[in-house]
């Protein structure tokens, strides 16, 4: 129990998919919690000189509970993991369970803004959009450029955000 019952990416990546289909109210509560702590995620992004929102790697109350260390702090894929789980839940249940669409739109827009500010078009790569200095799910291969999982999930996050955009998107 090294994580002491805290929320972290495993919640959305491994636990939430099961509950989405077997106990939707439980999955909904996980995702609503992420909506509830969005202001803290916005504060965290600002602390790291990023736009939008960056959810904490590990939390119990919306604040980052892990000590700062580069490999952990660079696990930005947490944002995409949350949006991917949220999208899966909404695709499965639509509006049947009353998820607040304004919160959905804001979560999507703010996490998309984080990716836009984290990545950059790099001239020596042919001006491809790169997301550098990140740590993917393999915590033992830390601080790399263009981690495949991170880049794939960032793309998913951006595409979901466009598809679910509303008044919050710009």
Regions found by a protein language model. Give the residues of each.
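Solvent-exposed loop and edge beta-strand segments that line ligand/cofactor-binding
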Residues: 1-10, 66-78, 138-151
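Long, hydrophobic, well-ordered secondary-structure blocks that form the structural core
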Residues: 1-11, 17, 33-39
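Hydrophobic (often cysteine-bearing) scaffold residues that line and stabilize catalytic clefts
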Residues: 10-11, 23, 27, 104, ...
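Well-ordered alpha-helical scaffold segments within catalytic/enzyme domains
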Residues: 13-25, 81-96, 114, 118, ...
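Helix-terminus loop motifs that line ligand-binding clefts
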Residues: 25-84, 88-102, 107, 111, ...
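Acidic/histidine-rich catalytic neighborhood
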Residues: 63, 110, 114-170
